[in-house]
């Protein structure tokens, strides 16, 4: 076992720097080449023991800087919309809407990595993670202490985002798989404008 651990470490150290840098370089290339994105997503949440506690599907759209929309469709409906100034989280079943200023909602959140400005290193410490799945992985650790999560991992094929993983302090892992991805589509501004439903219970600023 000790020999295997040492051998693994030696192999890791022998990987060329250009290969080990792929994750962060792919993240930076994504920022440069992708100003808008539309995709279907499948999201699975596991607990600290690896048990699946949630699985949902939906569609997402983003347009930098600061505009995004996540529509959860299965097994329940929920909407998260960022219009560049505020973030709106709506639960139709409860008819409840939570509103937060964009600066407080995504400064050091996973959303800021995708829809925020290109200077991710201002809010995150970026490193490359090596995995055997054929993707280039970048790890982003928030510099703010109150971000609500420990790290985000983003898996790329070239400069195209394929997967995301969110790890929180309780050991929960949220894995997001993207498919039917469109890069730089024309997205109407109305997609990021949230209209408050009649009678909704509004919470927040």
UniProtKB/Swiss-Prot annotation:
- Family to which the UniProt record says this protein belongs: Belongs to the LolA family.
Cited Pfam families: LolA
What is the name listed in the Swiss-Prot or TrEMBL entry for this protein?
Answer: Outer-membrane lipoprotein carrier protein
Could you tell me which PANTHER family the record lists for this protein? OUTER-MEMBRANE LIPOPROTEIN CARRIER PROTEIN
Tell me what gene encodes this. lolA
Chief subcellular location equals periplasm
List cellular component terms (GO).
periplasmic space
Q: What does this protein do?
A: Participates in the translocation of lipoproteins from the inner membrane to the outer membrane. Only forms a complex with a lipoprotein if the residue after the N-terminal Cys is not an aspartate (The Asp acts as a targeting signal to indicate that the lipoprotein should stay in the inner membrane).
GO BP: any one term: lipoprotein localization to outer membrane
Q: Which organism is it from?
A: Methylobacillus flagellatus (strain ATCC 51484 / DSM 6875 / VKM B-1610 / KT)
What quaternary structure, including any partners, is listed in this protein's UniProt entry? Monomer.
Show which residues constitute the signal peptide: 1-21
């Amino acid at each position: 076992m000790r020999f295997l651990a040492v051998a693994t470490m030696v192999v890791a150290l022998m990987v060329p720097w250009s290969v080990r840098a792929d994750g962060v370089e792919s993240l930076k290339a994504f920022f440069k080449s992708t100003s808008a994105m539309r995709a279907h997503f499948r999201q699975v949440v596991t607990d600290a023991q690896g048990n699946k506690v949630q699985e949902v599907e939906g569609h997402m759209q983003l347009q930098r800087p600061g505009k995004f929309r996540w529509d959860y469709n299965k097994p329940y409906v929920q909407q998260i919309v960022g219009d560049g100034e505020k973030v709106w989280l709506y639960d139709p079943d409860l008819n409840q809407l939570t509103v937060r200023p964009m600066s407080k909602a995504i400064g050091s959140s996973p959303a800021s990595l995708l829809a925020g400005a290109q200077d991710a290193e201002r809010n995150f410490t970026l490193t490359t993670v090596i995995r055997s799945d054929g993707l280039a992985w970048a790890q982003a650790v928030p510099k703010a202490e109150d971000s609500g999560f420990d790290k985000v991992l983003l898996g790329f094929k070239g400069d195209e985002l394929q997967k995301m993983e969110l790890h929180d302090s309780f050991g929960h892992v949220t894995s997001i798989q993207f498919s039917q991805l469109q890069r730089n589509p024309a997205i109407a501004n109305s997609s990021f404008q949230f209209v408050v439903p009649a009678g909704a219970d509004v919470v927040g600023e």
